[in-house]
Regions:
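Extracellular jelly-roll beta-sandwich "head" domains, especially the C-terminal globular C1q domain
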Residues: 4-156
């Protein structure tokens, strides 16, 4: 036989606040109509304008490679807007290797806007670059607007 349950005791103290993983984030853009030559094999896109980086994401001097200090799953999105429609592709490179989910393949019909949004697991110290490829020639990004942008937010 079981006795009746006794009264509920007082609430315990509140536990410590958990980590805010989304505090690891970055946004960078090219807004001044940059023009650059693209190689078929790929060229990193410089994002020197409108940079908002948390302290644990840094950028190199060329503004085209971002290093993440914290390992985790990241939501990444990018946009590339060219003045002229082109048959180029875009992708995210991590430590020199293409992230397959990020790839927007070169198309037979020219496009002036390429974008993608995906999740990727990054190791601490990973070097991340936005790259265009599959086209050999000059690319001019939209001026006075978002010619290209990259956003990364750590989710876990």
């Amino acid at each position: 036989m079981t006795a009746p349950t006794g009264p509920t005791g007082p609430a315990g103290p509140t536990g410590p606040t958990g980590p805010n993983v989304t505090a690891t984030n970055a946004y960078a853009a090219s807004t001044k109509g940059a023009a650059f030559t693209v190689l078929m094999s790929g060229t990193n896109v410089a994002l020197p304008d409108a940079q908002t980086l948390s302290p644990d994401i840094t950028v190199n001097g060329a503004n085209d490679t971002f290093t993440v200090a914290e390992a985790g799953r990241y939501r990444v999105s990018y946009n590339i807007n060219s003045v002229t429609p082109l048959t180029l592709g875009a992708r995210l490179m991590v430590d020199g290797t293409e992230i397959e989910a990020s790839n927007v393949m070169p198309q037979t019909a020219p496009l002036s806007r390429l974008s993608n949004d995906f999740l990727v697991d990054l190791a601490a110290g990973a070097k991340v670059s936005l790259q265009v490829y599959g086209y050999a020639g000059l690319v001019t990004l939209l001026p006075n607007s978002i010619g290209a942008s990259l956003s990364m937010v750590r989710l876990s």
